[in-house]
Amino acid sequence: MNNKKNIILLGATGSIGESSLRLLRKNKEKFNLVGVSAHNNAELLSKIVNEFDVPNVVLSDPKNVKSYYGKNELYVGQSSLIELAKIKCDVVISGLIGTSGLYPAYAAISAGNNLAIANKETLVSAGKIFMKKSFEKKVKILPVDSEHSAIFQCLEKNNISNVDFVTLTASGGPFLN
């Protein structure tokens, strides 16, 4: 019997993607990587696809498509990224940068997938819409980046009515190095 969780990883070649892949490597008995995307790093995407035998693969920027050598078929473009997020799975991890993750994240929720999201911009720009849709679809939105995950964990265990405002900072992504 297979009780593994099926995972789709959007933004596999970035810092959130790398962290997620380390976790998946350490827990191969618990997770299947069923979908993966990168923006333009086709070579690293190929390595990931070959290592995990990922069946659903997207490169959102077509410029480097000739550098892809993964063993499974590659789909290209932003519309393919949105279609990838709609594939039924247990969790879509979105490590996409800024508002580029807005449509794929909404597609994931609309398809009934739980969403582990690493960027703040998506929820800042469309938080009410996302929360309404997640409630309607009975799915969870889980923050995975350090700052908003810490805030989520604090608020989850305390009385939220005692909070007047929350200030978010940035330390990863382009600020990492």
Segments the model singles out, each with a brief description of its role:
Residues 76-107:
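Beta-loop-alpha module in the N-terminal Rossmann-like domain of NAD(P)-dependent dehydrogenases
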Residues 107, 127-177:
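Rossmann-like NAD(P)H-binding beta-loop-alpha module
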Residues 13, 49, 57, 92, ...:
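Residue-level signal for inorganic ion chemistry
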Residues 95-96, 108-124:
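ADP-ribose/adenylate-binding Rossmann-like module
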Residues 41, 60-66:
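Short, polar loop motifs at secondary-structure junctions
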Residues 53-55, 71-73, 111-114, 136-139:
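A short helix->loop->beta-strand "cap" motif at the edges of active sites that frequently abuts
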Residues 58-60, 73-80:
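Short acidic-hydrophobic, aromatic-tinged amphipathic segments that line or gate anion-handling sites
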Residues 1-54:
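N-terminal Rossmann-like dinucleotide-binding module
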